[in-house]
């Protein structure tokens, strides 16, 4: 796609070469492109940025009411990945990928309005991003109760548990559930855990399941519709 694109600009080249050396440039280039787009579009009432925390958000904030969504501070992801990574090569790659955090650490304290989904995240944002608590507004995640509601037609299966994992990284907390299954399986041999998510082949979750010897007690489901969930 890069080589086929005509009229490449600085962000295109920056994105391409930073990705080549193992970085994650999209946070920065997204902000630059958003700023360029909004410079000729003044009809918007406000702007919501979903955690890019790019330098351009400082400028956009001067032109529009800006709401900065931070689900959780990504320095925690880096912290956990480095903790569980094995080998200097893997750790070097992780540090390179998270290099955009230098930018986010500078931008976050300058945001006027930050939205967080929980008090726990709010506390972490203050801790890791050094943001004034008065700038952070907690708005809990919502759920569509027209879709996700009790279904009386489906009977409950004893000892069957369901959980979700949006990414195969220790931060998501699936480790604790898997270790709990390992403890409970002796007392409840029919226990079964269904994980809505996809583990990386040979990744952290697969290795832990193999180490605990609970393959027969855990299964994964992916690409489900809302109704199937």
What are these regions (language model features)?
Residues 36-37, 74, 91-114:
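Membrane-proximal helix-turn-helix segments that form the acceptor-binding/catalytic region
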Residues 46-48, 60-86, 90:
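Active-site proximal beta-strand in glycosyltransferases
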Residues 1-32:
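A conserved catalytic-core segment of Leloir-type glycosyltransferases
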Residues 164-165, 190-206, 222:
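Glycosyltransferase donor-sugar binding loop
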Residues 120, 142:
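Carbohydrate-associated surface elements
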Residues 154-172, 178-181, 194:
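Conserved donor-binding/catalytic core segment of Leloir-type glycosyltransferases
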Residues 37-56, 65-67:
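Short N-terminal targeting/anchoring amphipathic segment
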Residues 203-228:
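Nucleotide-activated donor-binding/catalytic signature segment of Leloir-type glycosyltransferases, i.e.
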């Amino acid at each position: 796609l890069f080589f086929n694109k005509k009229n490449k600009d600085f962000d295109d080249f920056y994105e391409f070469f930073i990705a080549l050396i193992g970085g994650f440039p999209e946070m920065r280039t997204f902000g630059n492109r958003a700023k360029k787009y909004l410079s000729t579009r003044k009809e918007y009432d406000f702007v919501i940025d979903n955690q890019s925390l790019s330098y351009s958000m400082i400028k956009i904030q001067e032109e529009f009411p800006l709401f900065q969504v931070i689900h959780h501070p990504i320095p925690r992801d880096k912290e956990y990945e480095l903790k569980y990574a094995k080998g200097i090569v893997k750790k070097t790659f992780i540090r390179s990928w998270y290099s955009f955090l230098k930018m986010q650490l500078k931008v976050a304290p300058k945001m006027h309005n930050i939205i967080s989904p929980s008090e726990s995240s709010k506390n972490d944002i203050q801790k890791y991003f050094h943001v004034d608590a008065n700038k952070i507004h907690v708005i809990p995640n919502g759920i569509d109760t027209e879709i996700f509601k009790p279904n009386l037609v489906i009977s409950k299966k004893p000892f069957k548990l369901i959980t979700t994992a949006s990414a195969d990284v220790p931060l998501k907390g699936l480790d604790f559930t898997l270790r709990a299954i390992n403890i409970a399986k002796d007392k409840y041999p029919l226990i079964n855990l269904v994980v809505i998510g996809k583990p990386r082949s040979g990744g952290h979750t697969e290795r832990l399941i193999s180490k605990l010897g609970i393959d027969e007690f855990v299964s994964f489901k992916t690409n489900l519709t809302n109704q199937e969930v």
